[in-house]
Amino acid sequence: MIYSTEVVNMNM
């Protein structure tokens, strides 16, 4: 489950 990185990329 890769959600942390997904959220970080979205925030960036």
Swiss-Prot record:
Additional notes on this entry: On the 2D-gel the determined pI of this unknown protein is: 5.4, its MW is: 29.5 kDa.
Protein name listed in UniProt: Unknown protein CP 39 from 2D-PAGE
Source organism of the structure: Clostridium pasteurianum
